[in-house]
Amino acid sequence: MVYIILGNGFEEMEAVCPCDMLRRGGVQVQFAGIGGRLITGGNGITVQTDCTVEEMDLDAMEMVVLPGGMGGVRSILGSEAALNAVRYAWEQDRYVAAICAAPSILAKLGITDGKKAVVYPGLEDQMGTALMQDANAVRDGKVLTGRAPGAAMDFGSLLLETLKDA
C-alpha cells in the first residue's frame, strides 16, 4: 500500500498525478487526510481521502508520499500522526517520497542526511546535509524526491519504477 498524505493547502498536481500513475501501474494507493477526509488543495480543489492519517495501516505501507504546497507542508509538520507515519516508514526500511517543498520535512527528520535529493528551487538551505542534485526526480536508496509541480510526472514515474522493481 502506498499512502499519499494530504493536508490543507497541498499542491494538487503533486498528489493526483503520482496517484494516477501508480494506480494505472497496478499499485494500491490511498490518500490519507490530516484533520479529516475532505482536504482542500492550494488551488481550491477539494479531495475526499480514503482514510485519515490516524487510520493508516502502517504495517501494510510500502511507501509514504508527501506532496508539496506550503500549506500542505505546514499541515504535515503540525500533525504528529503524519510525522509518525513518515518516521515509521523510514525506521521500518520502507520507501519515503516527497516532492516540491515537502523534502524539507524529510530533512527536518534527518531522512535526507547524506542522501541525494532535490527540492523546490530556493529551499535548498532547508535541506541540511542532503546532497543536492540538478534533476526533476531523484532516488537514493529508499528516499525519493521531486523538484516541483512541473516534475510531478517524472516523480510519479520514479515512484512506479521503484515499486515495480522492488
How would you name each of these model-derived features?
Residues 99-100:
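Short, thiol/selenol-centered motifs that function as redox-active sites or metal-ligating centers
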Residues 1-96, 105-114, 125-166:
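Extended, subdomain-level signal for the structured scaffold at the beginning of enzyme domains
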Residues 117:
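Anionic-ligand binding patches
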